[in-house]
Amino acid sequence: MTAIETDTPSNKVKEDESTDLRKDREKKKRSRVKQLLADIAKQVDFWFGDVNLHKDRFLREQIEKTRDGYIDISLLASFNKMKKITTDSKLIARAVKNSSVVEINLSGTKIRRRFPLGEKPQDVDSRTVYVELLPKNVTHSWIERVFGKYGMVVYVSIPRYKSTGDPKGFAFIEFETQEQAAKAIEVLNNPPEEAPRKAGMFPKTVKNKHLPPVEVTEHSITEGCGTEEKKKKKKKKSKARKDSVEKAEEDTKEQDMDIISEGVPKRRKTVSESSVPDVQEADKQTAKKEKKKKERAESFDQSEKVRQGKRKCSSSEEHDCSSAKQKKSDTKDLPQDEKPMVTQEVLQECKELSTEEEKDAVDKKEISVPKVKRKRKKKHKERHRVGEEVIPLRVLSKTEWLVLKAEYLTLQRASMASLKKSMSEMNHISEEEMQTQPSMQSFDIKNGKVETVKNEPLGPQFVCGVIGKITSSDPLQGRKYVKDAFSGVCEVVYVDMLEGDTECHVRFKSPEDAQTAVKTRSDLQGKHNWKLQILAGDNEQRYWQKILVDRQAKLNRPREKKRGTEKLIAKAEKMRLAKTQEASKHIRFSDGF
């Protein structure tokens, strides 16, 4: 019985601990789910809100397709932003259960707006601001945090490049009222000095790929980023100067201490304590020390002039020092046995002088160091305050931006017109050249008007005995390699092969070229291990039929349509490349020059 009684309380304690742990886990799960549900509800309410639906054509069309306005929740789960949060349709339905914007059907699989969508407001442009010079990695949350201080931000649009997905460097922010937009423009319109004077960013592209913009990092958002680096450099220089001055002070102190120690005569040694060679070595060392001291004194003469708090010796101290030096010189002249013993009074005086100097220097350092630290801290705080308040952005109303856009479009049209004119002048062929070259156009007169009809270029015409077949034991290296092999013997028009093939067809310019190639068959066999055969009869006709079929398939292949400015710019680019190739050609002079 005693064993049972002792076990029961411990079991109860364990059960209590386990229940506490379960409660803690449940609490943690609830907090996470609450945040998740709040994020889902916020996103869905935004999608079905008036501001977004007036701009989101895809979602508006999906709602208009249905008779009752319901759309599947699975469609919302397929959106990229919702994928980052969750893909569970049931969790989405649970999140928007108590929403004031949307409602769910009885089965919990479809969702719709509670109230029908009204007409689009007319004052959207006046409530919208345009902002440029944004950082490269700008996000919606960053814009909401910066612009949300001056009003309720209802919509943020960050245009991005299709090719890379990078932001274009500008954005449009819609506020709830016009007053909030005007306040944001007044406070946040602080463009840096390096920025262009005229506002309006219209990014340029080359072959549907944007030119790399100027990188603006997070550090460049706060004002005075470059000035901070300069100040840091100045601080480093000032620190180095202070360190050099302090070193000079320490060296001068050591020098003074050495002079005092030199003024004090050394204790007399007996014959048993030191030998004669030891004394000679000691004299050499003292001579070296004196030389070093003289060099130090000369190098730090300038620093001693600038240095404040320099110790000035009184007449009594100078007298003591000079007397000590005289004593030292006298003792040097005397033999070692006759040197007098140093009194305790002289040693105490020297110690007192050194301690007074050290105290003065320490007091000066204690006074100067805290002042410098305080100044640095104040500057650092002021810098942070400036960085929080001032952001180098250019902000203006969307109505002003639309005016700039119209100006840009007129300039673009004018430049395109001048480009067309210059291209037509370049493509214009003179009458003399037209007479020399065969005309590719036929003229048709209808109703008194002359219409030009372009004759389509014909394909390769059938010529007997110009097709050769090459077979190799190893994969062929390429078309250029095959052409180069025949270059010294005959002229090759086309090589029909794919990469890695062991067989290929060669079309020669004339039957005579084909016959000359056959004559060099043995050379090709020995050098390249190729077998050459000229096609004839049915094999030749089948191959010519294949040529025509391949050509027709190539002509009927769907091409990427280019219209407007893209087509014009592509033509101009081709002409520019042709010009550069002509200019890069070598000029060949005759032997006479």
From Swiss-Prot:
Keywords of this entry: Differentiation, mRNA processing, mRNA splicing, Nucleus, RNA-binding, Spermatogenesis, Transcription, Transcription regulation
Main localization of the protein described in the UniProt heading: nucleus
Compositional bias (Acidic residues): 248-259
Keyword Acetylation: no
GO cellular component, one term: nucleus
Keyword Transmembrane: no
GO function term, MF aspect, one: 7SK snRNA binding
Composition-biased stretches (Basic residues): 231-240
Region feature Disordered, mapped onto this chain: 1-28, 191-363
Domain xRRM: from-to ranges: 461-574
Annotated family: Belongs to the LARP7 family.
Domain notes: The xRRM domain binds the 3' end of 7SK snRNA (7SK RNA) at the top of stem-loop 4.
Subunit relationships: Core component of the 7SK RNP complex. Associates with box C/D small nucleolar ribonucleoprotein (snoRNP) complexes.
Function summary: RNA-binding protein that specifically binds distinct small nuclear RNA (snRNAs) and regulates their processing and function. Specifically binds the 7SK snRNA (7SK RNA) and acts as a core component of the 7SK ribonucleoprotein (RNP) complex, thereby acting as a negative regulator of transcription elongation by RNA polymerase II. The 7SK RNP complex sequesters the positive transcription elongation factor b (P-TEFb) in a large inactive 7SK RNP complex preventing RNA polymerase II phosphorylation and subsequent transcriptional elongation.
Name by which UniProt lists this protein: La-related protein 7
Organism from which the protein derives: Xenopus tropicalis
